[in-house]
Amino acid sequence: MFDLTGKTAIITGSSKGIGKSIATQMALHGAKVVVSSRKVEACQIVADEINEACKDSEGEAIVIPCNISDKTALQMLVDETRAQLGKIDILVCNAASNPFFGSMMDIPEDAFDKVMNNNIKSNHLLCQMVIPEMKERKDGSIIIVSSIGGLQASTVIGTYNISKAADIMLVKNLAAEFGPDNVRTNAIAPGLFKTDFARALWENPEILK
């Protein structure tokens, strides 16, 4: 059986959507999970739901808010997780940004930078912060939520797709380097889900075709 009892997990962007589902399922399978996004109130609602669902099991949820665009906030997320839960067994990099929908010819430079910083750099920084602990312990798991967009082209979310393709290569390189230390690094490439994040896509009937 799939059992995460005794494991601790950070899941970024877990106040809704895919991240919320990942955090919930990990807790239901015994993990202690950190629900994290920018808004503490939204995180607390999810954590309360998880704790209610897990009240008769080992799983539980705590809240540590974090703005992934801020390196100091990322380090605080890691440090506070260790302070409250003792260790980090699993890192799920799910949080991402896509502030622009349209031609790559029209994306403002600041929007381009935001996508690259939030979708690639923040994941890289978090991995740098947690891998040394995992390597020393000879055990750890990193999951980066990429996208089907990292594997195919788009006429309307090109910059986002570039960032998700980079995430896949980030995973491959980390797996090659730290796999021998039993630090397992994998990517998930979800298709189109009816989440708020992807609303501009699933509300467009032409794209759905």
Stretches with model-predicted labels:
Residues C127, S163, V171:
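Active-site helix of classical SDR
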Residues P132, A176-P180:
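Alpha-helical segment proximal to the catalytic Tyr-Lys
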Residues G102-M104, P108-M116, L208:
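Substrate-binding pocket helix/loop in short-chain dehydrogenase/reductase
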Residues H29-V46:
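Conserved glycine-rich Rossmann-like NAD(P)H-binding loop of the short-chain dehydrogenase/reductase
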